[in-house]
Amino acid sequence: STALAYAFAKCGMLSRNRGGMGGYAEYAFGKSGSFLANYAYCVSLLIANIAIAISAVGYAVALFGLKTTPFETCLLTILVLWICTVLNFKGAKITGLISNFTAWGVIIPVAGISVIGWFWFNPETYISAWNPHDLPTFDAISASISMTLWSFLGLESACANSESVDNPEKNVPKAVLGATIGVAVIYILSTNVAAGIVDNAELVKSTAPFGLVFATMFNGTVGQIVMGLMIMSCSGSLLSWQFTIARVFKSS
């Protein structure tokens, strides 16, 4: 993921084409290559945005103690997607302001677990969660690579939004590399610490894993506060991604 981030950063420094990754592909493959790159990227964003919306709904359901059917979850997910789409009508400035604020909803709990979660860390719980399906080493690595790349979907988002960025030749590479490295450190720490606090079986079943971890560390009230923060964060993230996918469609 870091190598990909570096490649995107270099492209951002050298490219003079519009359209982010599609613009990069255009140098070698022309307009058709640009369209195919953007088309494939949009397909991945459609899936990612739905996943983020479902996460927001999952945290909300857990926060309010609701029980929803798959159909009700689908309707709530569609509603969240539309709300974030409508909020983008005001343009990049409003989207940026809202996203900058809501980002703290994930920074606070994730950074918090990374720093203070070690006081509740149980090595035995962590070891039991390590490779729970007892896959051979290389099979486990192969299975995790695709999940890792999926987890870091977003390292290229600054490139996709380069037309909305001031001085993109300098700011896009900084954003891509800095954000990727920062997120990698924080999320690797937080997820590993969480795996040593709550049993793997409970984490897998939970629709609000960070809330569950904080509830285990402190109490249910703290867990609910974290769920509220994560709802805010997921909504802000979805807002940015809806903006991104619109820009990619437009440039295609």
Q: What does each of the following model-derived ranges do?
A:
Residues 1, 46-50, 85, 148-152, ...:
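Transmembrane alpha-helical core positions of polytopic small-molecule transporters
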Residues 2-81, 85-89, 94, 230-250:
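Hydrophobic transmembrane alpha-helices that form the core helical bundles
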Residues 13-16, 20-30, 97-100, 160-174, ...:
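Short amphipathic alpha-helical coupling elements at transmembrane boundaries
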Residues 21, 32, 42, 60, ...:
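Generic secondary-structure boundary signal with a strong preference for alpha-helix termini
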Residues 67-72, 101-228:
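Helix-loop-helix junctions that connect adjacent transmembrane segments
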